[in-house]
Amino acid sequence: MHAVELSSPSVNQPIRRFDFLIAGSGFSGSLLAWILASQGRSVLLIDRSRHPRFAVGESSTPTADFLLAYLAERWGLKQLAPLACWGQWKKHYPHVVCGKKRGFSYYHHSHGREVDPSSLETQSLLVAASSQDAWSDTHWLRSSVDEFLANQACSAGATPIESTQIHSALFDPFEHRWSISLRSANETPGADIQVQATWLIDATGHQGLSSIGIDNPEDSHWMRTRTGAVYGHFVGVDPFTQAAIPQDPFCGDDAAQHHVLDTGWIWMLRFDNGVTSVGLVEPTSAARSQDHFWKTVQSHPSLARLMRNAKLVAPIGLKQPATCSEPVMACVDRMSRCRTRAWGPGWVSLPVSYGFIDPLHSTGIAHSISGVVRLAEA
């Protein structure tokens, strides 16, 4: 994404005003910016980091595909329509990385034991979501897909600023106007950018905007699901041929693959470029580290075989110092979260910022896009 440089106005220049400031240029923030800009709205799209960047929340569903197709038709976004199924995606955007997802596959693993092919009828499950490859769902390599959608938003007229976050914001309820100070990660205090916006959209994810004075604390105590994860992107993950049987309706690797353990489960999402997203999900009481991930894999022989040639390639920059180029797995102690409110005077949160439960069954993309649908039509 080619980010523009906004400067603070001089004494004789007016402060630049936008209809919408969208904080967060992930897929949901960028998709909303694309729609709004295509309808002639002035949109400022900011993000604290830069594209392309690592992210999870990578597996689509029939509901997500339906909503993408609906948005493409509803708002005349012909460039969006191919993302609604794997066949059209590969035909029109081979450079935007995805993976084939025919459905969901589940395999039970016992500690210290190989998966027994003779027990697969009772110890595995395949759930078909499409009848053929061409119409299948997709896994999204978010570094590629998010950048594509952000670029589409910019081409439609949105103004992008990267490596920048909101430093302070004040809402005038009488004018229905935000006065916002933006601070670049590369700037020192005193070089802030001043802008105004009618609406502030929170698409930042778990960070939220409470740090700038919006009273919207977390309210997660009631949630029954309390899980955390350790995850990353690997090359060299082997196919799970050990679990293939002739009567399978599709290959279990062409799916959101769930390896079910006694203590939790491991996801595997295979992209067409040889990268596989792998993550271990367990209750919040479990240990959370890269070493714990590998110990769990090694204690399940069939998983150890799958990962014997695997090499971690992302994320990069989590290890201190931040400039370190060595990849290290991301660790989240608790993924399940919820904010008190989804909206307030002059601001709205997209679902990605309001709350999240768990990656099980791949609900995240569809949930986020449903919020885009609602806001675009509001």
Spans of model-derived segments:
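Beta1/beta-strand and adjacent pyrophosphate-binding region of the FAD-binding site
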Residues: 12-28, 44
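Glycine-rich FAD pyrophosphate-binding loop
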Residues: 21, 37-58
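Glycine-rich Rossmann-fold phosphate-binding loop(s) that bind the pyrophosphate
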Residues: 24-26, 48, 142
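Conserved Rossmann-like nucleotide-cofactor binding loop
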Residues: 28, 51, 207
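N-terminal FAD cofactor-binding segment of flavoenzymes
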Residues: 53-115
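Flavin (FAD/FMN) cofactor-binding and adjacent substrate-gating region
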Residues: 93-144
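Predominantly flavin-linked oxidoreductase catalytic cores and closely associated redox partners
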Residues: 141, 147-306, 372
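FAD/FMN-dependent oxidoreductases across multiple families
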Residues: 262, 266, 284-378
